[in-house]
């Protein structure tokens, strides 16, 4: 982990053959802790921490097959609406 301030990331992982959500979530939760990860959908997670997007990508490298993909996005600003997003979790992380 770097010495920078924590930020919000979105991790999207997809496969034509299998659902990757649990596999990817477990791998990331092992590194950052379950309290800083929220599942957004079958293919997407919100992750809060002082990790570079490339670090998170590299954690997933050994899990994904050649035909599977992952994208890690880092946000400077965000906003949310509706019950599908854990508002209390976001508020506690600078929302």
Predicted regions span which residues?
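Short, intrinsically disordered low-complexity segments
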Residues: 31-76
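Short, low-order "capping/linker" segments at domain edges
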Residues: 54-59, 80-95
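N-terminal start-of-chain detector that recognizes signal peptides
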Residues: 16-20, 42-45
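Generic detector of low-complexity/intrinsically disordered segments
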Residues: 10, 22-25, 47, 92
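Short, flexible beta-strand-to-coil junctions
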Residues: 14-19, 75-77
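Conserved, structured core segments of small domains
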Residues: 19-31
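Short glycine-/aliphatic-rich beta-strand segments at the starts of folded cytosolic domains
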Residues: 2-16
